[in-house]
Amino acid sequence: QHDPLKLTEKDDRLYGLGSTDMKGFFAVIYAALEPLLRQELKFKQPLIILATADEESSMNGARTLAKLGKPKARYAVIGEPTGLKPINMHKSIMMETIRIQGQSGHSSNPALGKNALEAMHEVISALLNFTQQLQADYQNPHFAVDIPTMNLGVIHGGDNPNRICGHCELEFDVRLLPGMANDSIRESISKLVKPIASKYQTKISLTSLFPGVEAFENQ
């Protein structure tokens, strides 16, 4: 209904990409500080407003600042929309790619090729079953979504109905609960797809779109 890249006001609400997330926080903090700045008050300690890039995915901005050890602060307010409820944990985020390389050929004789789409069909079934098992084994009632999740977000494969699909790619994200490790899940997925590669005589590779962020809990 609204252009996400343009702030729109309607019925006392503001609509736009990030308006209730990080961009909303910047508007709030600026509004809160403006009266103090008008009074030309001298702060006893510096007050820093920090914005980081790639907050929704790779966290590259925050990673760089953490690596540099800057800035130093005694206290911090994180501008996430939590309804003023203290939050001491977050899920992990992984974004992964599975690539299947088969062998193309003419559809008149499918046996002459190695169909990457058929192999991917079995990979997807294995991933869904794996996710169901994770959700049965792990729950945390402190999260609104109290289970680990996997979203199959992007798939590309084939270029013509009369050709055997020689290449297929799947991109997905995984969000784990505290106590679960990203690398452990990657290893489990890698073991899942190996027998599928052998069955369909294809090559299957698993790579990360970015390093990922581990789940966190602060006692």
Segments the model singles out, each with a brief description of its role:
Residues Q1, I78, H167:
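Structural signature of FAD isoalloxazine-binding scaffolds in flavoprotein oxidoreductases
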Residues M95-Q219:
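Metal-dependent amide/peptide-bond hydrolase catalytic core
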Residues Q1, P86, E217:
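Short active-site-adjacent structural elements
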Residues K10-L14, S19-N129, D146:
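Fold-level recognition of mixed alpha/beta catalytic cores in primary-metabolism enzymes, strongest
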Residues K6, R13, V154:
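Conserved beta-strand positions that form and line the central face of beta-propeller blades
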Residues Q1-T8:
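Soluble metallo-hydrolase cores and metallopeptidase-like ectodomains found primarily
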Residues L7, I49, F172:
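Conserved hydrophobic/aromatic pocket- or pore-lining residues that grip, position, or stack substrates
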